[in-house]
Amino acid sequence: MAASGSFPLLVEGSWGPDPPKNLINKLQVYFQSRKKSGGGECEVVPEPGNPARFRVLFSPEDVRQNVLERGNHELVWQEKGTFKLTVLMPTDPEEASASKKSRKESPEEESKTKEDAVKQGDLDITHSPSSGSEKTEDVPKECENISSMVAFENLPEKVSEMVLTILVENISGLPSDDFKVEVNRDFAVAVVTFQKPIDIKKFIVDCISHRSNQQLQLAPRLLETTNVVRVENLPPGVDEYQLQLFFENPFNGGGRVARVECFPEESSALVEFCDSKVLDTVMAKTHSYNKMPLSVFPYYPSLGTALYGEEKPLIKLPASFQESLDLPLWKFFQKNNHLIEEINNEMRCCHCELTWSEINGKLTIRPAATLVNHRLSIKTWQRDASAVLSGIKSKYGVELFEVCSPVWDIIKHELESGDDRVLVEFEKESLNIAGKSEDVQGMSQKIRELIESTTEKLRREEQSLKEKVAISPGKHYLLHHSGFLKDLSKGFPEMEISYDATAQFLYLKGFRADVYKVKCDIQEKVFSMAQKDVQVSSEVFEFLQQVDSQRLSKSLFEAQNILAIYELKGTALFLVGSSFKDLAEAETKMLSALSHKQIEVEDKEVLISNGWKKKVHPLQKRHSSCATIIVQNELTSETPAKVIVTGCVKEVNEIHRQLFEYLENNMKVERALKIKPSLIVDYLRTDKRLLSKIKKAHVYVHFKPKDNPNSILLTGCKSKVLECMNLVKEIQDSVCVQRFQTDKAGVRHFFKDKESYYKTEIGRQFGCVIELEEDREEKGEEEDGEEEEGEEEGESSINEQKCHLQRDIAPGVKLFVLEEDLSRFPVDVVVNAANENLKHISGLAQALSKAAGPELQTECDQIVKEGGVVLPGNAVISKAGKLPCHHVIHAVGPRWKGDKVLECVSLLKKVVRQSLSLAEEHRCRSIAMPAVSAGIFDFPLELCVANIVSAIKEHFQHKRDTHTLKKIYLVGLPAKVARAFAEAVKTTYKDSLSHTAFPSSLKALVPLGKTPQKQGSLLVSPEGLRIRLVEEGVQNATTHAIVNSISPDLKLNKGPLSQAFLEKAGPKLQEELTRSGQGVSVDVGTILQTSGCNLNSRHVFHVVPPPWKSNNSAWSLKIMKNIIRDCLKTTENLSLQSIAFPAIGTGNLRFPKPEFAKLIISEVLKFSSRNQLKTLQEVQFLLHPKDHENIQAFSDEFDKRNNGDPSDKNPKAEDTQGIYGSLSSPTLGMHEMNIGPILFQVATGNIIKEVADVIVNSTTLTFDLKSGVSKAILEGAGQNVEQECSLLAKQSNHGYIVTGGGLLQCKNIIHVVGGNDVKKSVSCVLEECEQRNYSSICLPAIGTGNAQQDPNVVAKAIIDAIEEFVQKKSVQAVKRVKVVIFQPHILQFFYDNMKEREGSPAPPKQSPAKQSVMSKIASFLGFPKQASPKKNTLVLEKKIEHTVFQVCGSGVDSVNKTISWLKELITKEQLSYTNDDECVSDFDMEEYEKLNEIQKELNITIEMNQKKTSIQVSGISRDVIKARDEIEGMIKSIRLAKEKESQADYISTYVEWQYIDKNITQCFDKMTNMKLEVAWKAKKKDTVVQIHNQDFTVDLSTNTATAPQGQTFTVQRLVKAEAEIPANWSDMKQDKLLLVNLQTSDPEYNMVASAFRQTCSNFFIEKIERIQNPALWRRYQAYKKSMDEKNGNVRNEKHLFHGTEASSLPQLNSNGFNRSYAGKNATAYGKGTYFAVKASYSACDTYSRPDTNGRKYMYYVRVLTGNYTNGNASLIVPPSRDPQNAADLYDTVTDNDKNPSIFVVFYDNQTYPEYLITFRQ
């Protein structure tokens, strides 16, 4: 009910009958929110009796009205979702209007109002159909103490709780919220508890009389008030007394207990109180006993159960139990799952669940979940379940029988075939039967009878005997057909005789005496039979394997009364006869009656055609027992198929005839006709007459098949194909083929672009075909294009084979590894793996013999007859018979013997070498070789192929004469052999050099004046002895001999080296060494020899090395030399090929490792040079992989000798005899020689990639040259080196500075001035390095770049400096000086100088004074100074492109016409372009590289003309045009750069921009200086420049340079004194150019006119203008100032004339005579600008060309002529004045230095066009 002053609303929602928790709070918040609901202050309470409805009490009425007026209300609950709310006014009008009174009523009045409301409600209850108290308004007072519970007994199952609830509602008139119903199905009772007072008695009466109850037959009664409770969930062990105490405790709400009854199995008890009122207090409390919660419920004895209300009763199910089944019965059930399922279903009826054990007869019974609903059955459940299970078991039975094993073995087969209704099991002589009782009884009788009968049978059999006799089926056949077995059966009728053909046994069974008698008779008969091994062909043998031997024997022998049969045992054929006579007759009959024939089939498709099947099948069916037809078609695709007919002679002949005839008529064949050159194939393709004839013959022709492109493939019937082949050959012989070659650039490319068109046009006009001949390497042809027929065929076949590998193994010699059949391989000679008797009966030999025909075996037999057997390791040669080769070499390899490995390897190598030698003796060019000895001779494959390849390598390395063999084919089948060959070749030739480095071209070792060959860690002496460094243990050495280090007591267990030998070789090595040392005085230097025992080496040389004595090293060295020399000598005497030396003496004997390495290599080389070696081929230095010190020492020594420093001692510095060593060229582009102790090297390359202590940079006086090599060095070294240069350049120096190495691979960089004396600069470098203790120097060709010095002079100066350095002092540090040259042509100058001095002594030294006197005398006598040779121009890579065409036609005339047409076409496509611009001479490294790149990319050739300083491009027109554009772009860039540099020079004369770095003023370079000045004059705010290779932004208003990182420098502008503007110039008013027209009265006018008229008086002067160009004037004055300072008192300036045309005037007025104007009209005296002394020279029309108005123009020019000399057309700059100083040049050149009339100027700013004369005729 609402509180005072409230206005209620009812709220329902979509939450259902069970509202969620905290819903009231959510509703409270919602209805208090004006925004959400329109509400305000309120209170939410649940609606009494209806938990799903709530009442909201508002204070103001208008708030409630607002809520009602809002249409939709939704409560959004994030966790629960959104609930739809329904808001209603209360149905009670009084309650709804209660608010009108509420504001004035007191609490007492409110109470009164409530009572009135109740009363009013009571009055109205009879009128309200919805009222819940319709029949309870008059509750008698006597009913107030009566129980409010009614029990409905006899409750049917169909009456649900809902039905009962409706019934109670209908009878009582109360809603379901006013009473509770509890149904207990176990007791068929329901209890109704009323929440409100009601007349119970009347209700019971109404129930009984109600019509519904009459149908339901309920028995309602008043449920008494109880004083008993049921306590559940009792802890174990609680008894009645403890419970009595517990419930009498007042704290538990209890009272006096009358009685306690416990039920332990249910963990429950009944407690009866003396007073029933105690139940209210007990039930109101929560109870726990020993911390275990107790459940307490009222118990009604009349019902026999407690009432649990909303709680569920705690029901404890009984425990499970087990039953046992007889094991047989359990197994029976396991086999019949359906019976288990039936039993399970039957037991479920008594609430049981069964679990059947899987391992024994146990059965577990558990209560089912349904038992919970049948509490009355719980107590008797186990007893009931056991009874049901016993009833089920009684339906099944088990029977046991005692049976012995023998009986069971007999009867089990009968029992196993029975049905599955019973289980029959035998175990431990007991037979068990289980199943249903009736089935078991039926089976028991049968088994009992079976056991009795079987037992009796066994008893009888014990008295009998069974024997077996081993007889083959054939002999049994003879016994049977001879009637022998039939007679035995008649004589012994009770005996059982049987034969098992599979086991090949005859079984006898009967009485003991009879069996023994018959067995003896049979054995005697079998032993009397005759037997013989008969040899037949493999085909006949295979036929006999396929047919039934008895049936065939019967058909062969029975008709002739021959009692015989044949038998097959493994691979042997045996004839068995009843007698020797029968045997002889049978053999004769078999050999004559059986035969085989075969047909080779090339067309395998015919064998799978329907026609073939129709032909073969009838024949096979008709003659199935007499003949077989076998098709061998499972071989490789290259091998023809074979049809083999085998069987009886008559049938074989008939079948062969028919099949051969069919195949000849239906078989298609292919024939490839080799055509050379392949161009003829293209010609034949166009021959329509030929194609027509081939088509008529029904032959298909395929030109240039993929697998054989140089051939024609004909396919068709065999006879027709052969006819067409002859036809093709006739045409091939009649055609004409010619080759045409041209070296013009791009011909190949332009022809390929339109190849199809050109070929079509040539065919149309001349009837010829043309082919662009590809490179020889691409076609795989020899260079001369002519090969012998055999080689051609071999090469052709390569394309058809699986080529695993191809390798060049010697100059002009190729090695191939193929997977191929040797019997079909076309080469000059084939190697056959033969046996000693040359009998080719198996393997490869048999295949070759078969393919060659009988003549091969005949010739081999004759060879053996005449010369005896061929011993292993030897080879003989024979003809090839029908093989596709000229010869066959029969190589007899060794048979593998594991205990004689070295001997086998030696013999194998020997036979390979002999085979190669035989091939070359017979002038063979190609040879095919198999894996000799790897087949039936059992040689391990990997070892075999490795030694074959090794022998081939040795053959070509050591045989120096010309080889006829050009191709070696290593052929292997199957593929694994070819793969093994390929791996062996890769391993053996992995360190191979190019052709130029093969032994035939090897150079000698440096100490002998030559250079050794280098192959990894390999040296080769001049005599061919290989010296190899091998990192491997001595145990793995494979040399013929090996050296061991031992102590004088000969004990091998001392020292790690000898221990390693002993461990591998075994104790026998120690025994041999001890025997070898007997009677010998063993001391230092002693050498003892033994075999290798288990080592891979044949011999071991045991040496006693000397200890190292530092105070007497000469003694140690002498003994070690003798040891090495004696070991080498012994190896040669024993005819051994190789020896290995470990690092003997370098361990415990402390021999210095570097000293030993140097000593032993030197001794081996000396031995090689002083002895003519016959067998020794290789010396190995064997070093353990972990012996790093020795490896390093030997590696260093090898590197020294490979790098050209092999001398054992450096010559002394003071030794002037032979100071220059021999000149050698160890690698392409490198020359070297020793100058005293210094190794001097010259090579082309990139200096910044060199590794040295010092790198030399050739630069300018300011040490900031940024072009050419100097630029590369500075950029490579990095910014720090550049900064260091700029700082050191400002300090005093001696013509060079030393900086750090920066990022280059050196310690320091020495910067020298390239324009200075080169010899002096190099001397300074040498002295500096010697003082710094540096050993290696790397320098460029100083002065040949920017300084433009003569390369020949530079080369001479560098070598002179080194010579002088060596002579004047003892050199200690410097060991190597290397000159790295960028321009390849300069290398020749150095080579010529070195070659000139090779092996010569140094010239005698002259004192400087003497030199000076001599030069003065020469000058006094008038000898001219030696003229300086011209500077060499840039040399490009020479590009040579040869293009070869082949033309084929029907005759010579048509071919010649085609070639002429082609030549004309090439000429039309070619274009030539020449540029002789002076800027070509300024091409630098970058332009050189770009030109080479252009030449490579385009189809052109570029040539530089050094004399004319021009560049010429030739090639295809479009590519020449592209190249022209590129070159002109390069020239333009250079010209612009020069102009820019000239402008920068000019600006630097009057202004200098500087920055301050660490209080030091630094000047910007001239280009940056110009950039800043231009920006400053343009009044720009800022500009970006570089300082220390980093971008800085210069603010021109604050003069501050700032880097992106914030670093700043102060910048300042310093103005120098500018050249003054002439005083007579007119005011220009800020104009940059002004032309002032002079008046005729001006002195200037008269001065110019007078000079002009001296030689041009016949011309009329229209006007003379003064040209005022301040910028041009200042540059000119700056140049003049520089020249005046340089030349001293020489008059440097002249006024000269220059005629020009009108179009050039604006350019000349603005920019003067710069280089773009040079050579425009003349080049007779150099490529410059020409000026005349006389005006008449310039006035001619050639120079001053008249314009359209007839006006001519001439400048009167100020020219700085300075020092001049005679010029020539080749000059692009003035020549040098001083040969010793190439940088000192003349200023100008003239036509006559005595009386000049013309001057040629080469530089910008050297002239100023002061006056312009306009004149006419």
From Swiss-Prot:
Domain PARP catalytic: 1621-1817
Gene3D superfamilies assigned: 3.30.70.330, 3.30.720.50, 3.90.228.10, Leucine Aminopeptidase, subunit E, domain 1
Positions of the Macro domain: 802-989, 1014-1202, 1227-1398
Function statement: ADP-ribosyltransferase that mediates mono-ADP-ribosylation of glutamate residues on target proteins. In contrast to PARP1 and PARP2, it is not able to mediate poly-ADP-ribosylation. Catalyzes mono-ADP-ribosylating STAT1 at 'Glu-657' and 'Glu-705' and thus decreasing STAT1 phosphorylation, negatively regulates pro-inflammatory cytokines production in macrophages in response to IFNG stimulation.
Gene Ontology terms, MF aspect: enzyme binding; NAD+ poly-ADP-ribosyltransferase activity; NAD+-protein mono-ADP-ribosyltransferase activity; NAD+-protein-glutamate ADP-ribosyltransferase activity; nucleotidyltransferase activity
Processing and modification events after translation: Auto-ADP-ribosylated.
Catalytic activity from the UniProt record: L-glutamyl-[protein] + NAD(+) = 5-O-(ADP-D-ribosyl)-L-glutamyl-[protein] + nicotinamide
Residues annotated to bind a glycoprotein 3: N1246, I1247, S1258, V1269, G1343, T1344, G1345, N1346, A1347, F1382
Residues modified as Phosphoserine: S33, S1419
GO biological process terms on file: innate immune response; negative regulation of gene expression; negative regulation of type II interferon-mediated signaling pathway; positive regulation of interleukin-4-mediated signaling pathway
Protein name, per record: Protein mono-ADP-ribosyltransferase PARP14
UniProt domain WWE: residue ranges: 1539-1617
Tissues with expression: Weakly expressed in the thymus during development and in adulthood. Expressed in macrophages.
PANTHER family reported for this sequence: PARP/ZINC FINGER CCCH TYPE DOMAIN CONTAINING PROTEIN, PROTEIN MONO-ADP-RIBOSYLTRANSFERASE PARP14
